[in-house]
Amino acid sequence: MAKSNIFVLVLVTFIVASCSDKTVITSNLLHPYAMCEYDGGILISNFGGDAVDYNNTKATGFITYYKNGSNQVVIPAGNGLYSPKGMAVKESFLFVADVNKIVVFDLDGYKKVDEIEFPQGDAFVGDLLVMGNALFASVANYDRIYLLDITAPRQIDHTSLLEYVELPCPSTLKLMGEYILVSSNSFGKADREDKIIHIIDDLGNPSIRPIIHEHGDYQGLAFSPNKTRLIFCNQERNGYIGNLVFENGEYSYEQVTDDKSLLNSLLLLDGKMYICDLLNSKIYIKELIEFDNFSGIIKTD
């Protein structure tokens, strides 16, 4: 009897529950863009308004806080947010990326304390990242990441806002040790071959290199719990999230929803993965079961 061994590499980072088992947050959401972990819960930025608009001209934006199964509005519309995007927290202060500005709130009472505007007047500020006393801000339409000194969050020197590094259509920023991963997303404004995922190697003397070469509109970066993989959204693959193995650079995609969606942001918290759907005003919650390595499956005929 002839026997053959078939070795199958399973490129699966995680197994998620079927669509019928998934939990979905919908309460008090209206076009949720980004999530930020805070005090055991999740701050969520919402565009508000009648339709998805990255550059709202009315202050329809608001922030909710999800914890213990409840999602409550903590910064209502009308408080100076138009299309609030990425967020970052330092101490008790929340920094919010918005249309041509960064807005600062004191989380003790959720009061607005400052607003740092970009001088050009039309900056698409997409995401923020805190590292020590520095705040990194991505601006997709300028092909730039900026740096702001936030040593004293109540007394920020607005003139400290400086260009940091140039790279194509920067959107989501994610810190990994002494490196920053940057997704590229033109938000439908340009079709460019260099819309990929980059890594900034040396933060003191920034240089960039690609870690994914496939053209796409990338958004929402997260790490697997053991930091061996990068999980991401590619908005050119509707309803799917991707995962990349750092060890060998291979990646694959996992379907999250059959709905026409715009998956925009990812957050891993307490063994669950939260996935923002900007278009449908939903956040999917998935249980996460992870494999550390590829699984070898041997079949004998």
Label the model's feature ranges:
Residues 16-18:
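C-terminal motif of bacterial Sec signal peptides marking the signal peptidase cleavage site
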Residues 20-26, 70-78, 111-118, 154-165, ...:
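A short beta-strand motif characteristic of beta-propeller blades
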Residues 28, 44-57, 95-101, 137-143, ...:
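Conserved beta-strand positions in repeat-built beta-propeller and related beta-rich domains
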Residues 29-39, 78-93, 119-132, 136, ...:
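Beta-rich, blade/repeat-based domains predominating
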Residues 53-64, 101-103, 144-147, 195-198, ...:
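A short loop-to-beta-strand structural motif that recurs across blades of beta-propeller domains
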Residues 66-70, 106-111, 149-154, 200-205, ...:
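Short loop/turn segments that connect beta-strands within beta-propeller blades
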Residues 101-102, 107-131, 161:
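Asp-box/WD-like beta-propeller blade repeats and closely related beta-sheet repeat scaffolds
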Residues 263-301:
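Blade-level signature of beta-propeller repeat domains, shared across WD40, Kelch, NHL, RCC1
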